[in-house]
Regions:
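Intrinsically disordered, low-complexity tandem-repeat regions
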Residues: 11-14, 19-23, 28-33, 385-401, ...
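Nucleotidyltransferase catalytic core that binds NTPs
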Residues: 2-11, 15-18, 24-320, 331, ...
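Serine residues within intrinsically disordered or low-complexity segments
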Residues: 3-7, 17, 26, 402, ...
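Generic C-terminus detector
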Residues: 348-406, 416-439
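Acidic/histidine-rich
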Residues: 307, 311-359
Length: 439
């Protein structure tokens, strides 16, 4: 990707950076959508072209069906952004090109009637549900779009050819739907990144709007594949989000220790204990040791975050049923390469694992060096966060004791995110990025 998917607010003017826009979840929800008029269901590109487009802009939400609240959040965000004069198109297409050998193409849920109902209730004007022959006339295309080096990492390494299939169908659906805006969930962070890069490199005149991950009350990221999980498997699957939250909280604890070390200074041990006592600490000696450790630079954000997440995942591997880890990676959002231990700035902590026969993915966005002025400014400037997690860097711990407690793998259950209420959009004047198929 030319630039990070962690990017400015969707209300900012379009520019030539090709950055994925992100919905800000800090605004109150918009009024309920009037679903008295059902969405038009069309199956061909010709039928879609024949529908009146109106005077506003068109937004598209690309899905593979089996719609759930995560998809509804995308549709509502699109509805709010385009306003009453705009048009929201939801595509429902299970793309065979992005399934590898032995994957779940045949059993992938297909619930079109329910999908149309949910889409209409969330604010969609049109549901475009083409057949495989409509999208790929004459069979699988001989020419496909290659995802390049970024598409060979993580998900691409585990599922060879997956992102080539994603990019090929996204390009075709963008041509068929001709949107001005495209909305995509941040749960599939690598997919969002490769599609944004494709849009930048190939000059698609579409603006991406990234929408924060939607989670269940217990933290599990919403996915169409969650329905495959049995009760015990679902309990094990909670380790994915728990691992991410543990890394977030441990990072916050480390930053608190570093800030305290800076405030106490490099005094001899007795003076340090006295300084901590003056701050109101009850356990001055223990805290002095922890602060001295932080001041010496022994803690490193990326290494500590990885270790905290791995501890949770290692425990989950011993559950019944067990979690089988595919990867845990802390990556630079611009190219999805692993970040070094000295890294400062925004990063994505991504995890993929199997529980039973179901493969699940999740991610969280972290800021390393959050207490430093330059990192804080970047984090507050509209960059992406996982809205469910009320601040991925976590709250600053008040004491070294609470900092240690924050390294526990347990984390509070996140609340459901709100979706930005944004004013009607105008068509972008410069090429932006498109939106990919929602998994």
């Amino acid at each position: 990707m030319t630039s990070s998917p962690l990017s400015p607010h969707p209300d900012q003017p379009a520019d030539a950076s090709h950055q994925a826009r992100t919905a800000d979840a800090s605004h109150p929800p918009a009024p309920p959508v009037d679903a008295s008029h059902p969405a038009h269901l069309v199956h061909t590109a010709a039928a879609l072209r024949d529908l009146p487009r109106g005077t506003g802009v068109r937004a598209v939400v690309m899905t593979m069906g089996a719609l759930h609240e995560g998809h509804a959040t995308l549709i509502r965000a699109a509805r709010r952004r385009v306003g009453p004069a705009g048009q929201v198109v939801v595509t429902v297409f299970v793309n065979p090109l992005q399934f590898g050998a032995g994957e779940d193409l045949d059993r992938y849920p297909r619930t079109l009637d329910a999908d149309v109902e949910l889409a209409a209730a969330a604010g969609a004007d049109v549901v475009f549900a083409p057949s495989v022959d409509e999208v790929y006339p004459g069979g699988e295309p001989q020419i496909r779009i290659a995802a390049g080096p970024m598409g060979a990492l993580l998900e691409g390494a585990s599922r060879p050819g997956h992102f080539d299939g994603v990019l090929t169908v996204v390009a075709k659906l963008l041509h068929l739907t001709a949107p001005d805006l495209a909305f995509y969930g941040q749960k599939d962070a690598q997919q969002l990144a490769v599609i944004t890069r494709m849009a930048a490199d190939l000059n698609f005149p579409v603006e991406i709007v990234g929408v924060p991950t939607v989670r269940e009350d217990d933290g599990l990221a919403l996915s169409s594949r969650n329905r495959y999980l049995s009760g015990p498997e679902r309990c094990t699957a909670l380790a994915l989000s728990a691992a991410l939250f543990a890394a977030r909280d441990r990072l916050a604890a480390e930053e608190a220790l570093r800030a305290r070390a800076a405030s106490v200074g490099h005094h001899p041990a007795p003076d340090r204990a006295a300084a901590l006592a003056a701050l109101g600490e009850d356990r001055a000696a223990a805290d002095a040791h922890a602060v001295a450790y932080a001041a010496a630079g022994a803690l490193h954000g990326p290494a500590v975050a990885r270790a905290a997440a791995l501890a949770v995942l290692d425990d989950a591997a011993r559950l019944d049923p067990p979690l089988t880890l595919d990867y845990l990676a802390l990556v630079d959002p611009s190219d999805f390469t692993e970040v070094p231990d000295a890294y400062e700035g925004e990063a994505i902590l991504a995890v993929a694992a199997k529980v039973g026969s179901t493969r699940l993915i999740d991610n969280i966005r972290l800021v390393f060096g959050a207490g430093r002025p330059e990192a804080t400014a970047a984090h507050q400037g509209g960059t992406t966060t996982d809205a469910v997690d009320t601040g991925d860097t976590g709250d600053t711990a008040d004491t070294a004791t609470s900092a240690a407690a924050a390294s526990s793998p347990s984390a509070p259950s996140p609340s459901a995110p709100s979706v930005t209420s944004t004013p009607p959009a105008t068509p972008p004047t410069t090429p932006q990025g498109p939106l990919g198929a929602t998994r």
